[in-house]
Amino acid sequence: MDKIIKSIAQSGAFRAYVLDSTETVALAQEKHNTLSSSTVALGRTLIANQILAANQKGDSKITVKVIGDSSFGHIISVADTKGHVKGYIQNTGVDIKKTATGEVLVGPFMGNGHFVTIIDYGTGNPYTSTTPLITGEIGEDFAYYLTESEQTPSAIGLNVLLDENDKVKVAGGFMVQVLPGASEEEIARYEKRLQEMPAISHLLASKNHVDALLEAICGDEPYKRLSEEPLSFQCDCSRERFEAALMTLPKADLQAMIDEDKGAEIVCQFCGTKYQFNESDLEAIINDKA
């Protein structure tokens, strides 16, 4: 089961979140049939949103949009504060690797664009923030958002490793934030440790990668685990929701679906689930509108 572990240094100088998101990203790949680069880009976005949602309280919903002008198109993710996330990428078929190393490429195919977050607190006044894409690698773009928009300097690591068949092998990430009151000496020590950390791809390849991430972040500094919470890919779409959407269409459009297509098929963008509405279903919707 995927999980996020929240911890804090006993000195109170920093906090760290580490995530295992392997099942989340694997299910997203399965549902959207993404190729290598698209899988990694979508996976990193989902992990970023899991971190962002874990930082919220109440029943907030958080939308992350990575909007580029190159091959990927838009990547959209929605998460809640209960550990659920869903998402999709416009172009599922990007599959580019470095010839020499086999490294999956992401940044060069994101292009210029923006990292957009929308936090809906359920009050009818969602908070929206937009920052430019810095590298297109998503982790750096997320860190820039946290620094610029939330005024919280953060170290971020996100990645998805694929097996020889380009299926998700492991996915996860971390966030480290210095807390108010940390001394200059403590800040310098944590910065040095982060700079000397192995690459996240190396840490994720470890047998117990969540523990490996925590150990690399904290080193010999004593820390306390605050919580361990489950994470999952879960879509909240339903037949009833799409039926309500059909109810908003003009009768003429619904009748055209009956006459020309003998029904309608609606596919959820977030999870790929298909909902069929036959002629009788559409006629009932038309009658309900009368």
Swiss-Prot record:
Cell compartment(s), UniProt: Cytoplasm
Name the InterPro entries for this protein: Heat_shock_Hsp33, Heat_shock_Hsp33_C, Heat_shock_Hsp33_N
- UniProt modification remark: Under oxidizing conditions two disulfide bonds are formed involving the reactive cysteines. Under reducing conditions zinc is bound to the reactive cysteines and the protein is inactive.
Q: Got any disulfides in this one, which pairs? A: 235-237, 268-271
Q: Which CDD domains match?
A: Hsp33
Pfam hit, one:
HSP33
User: Which GO molecular function terms does the record list?
Assistant: protein folding chaperone; unfolded protein binding
**GO biological process: what's one of them?**
protein refolding
- Keywords linked to the UniProt accession: Chaperone, Cytoplasm, Disulfide bond, Redox-active center, Zinc
Q: One GO term of the cellular component aspect?
A: cytoplasm
Name the family: Belongs to the HSP33 family.
The UniProt function text for this chain reads: Redox regulated molecular chaperone. Protects both thermally unfolding and oxidatively damaged proteins from irreversible aggregation. Plays an important role in the bacterial defense system toward oxidative stress.
Put simply, this protein is called 33 kDa chaperonin
Q: Which organism is it from?
A: Streptococcus pyogenes serotype M6 (strain ATCC BAA-946 / MGAS10394)
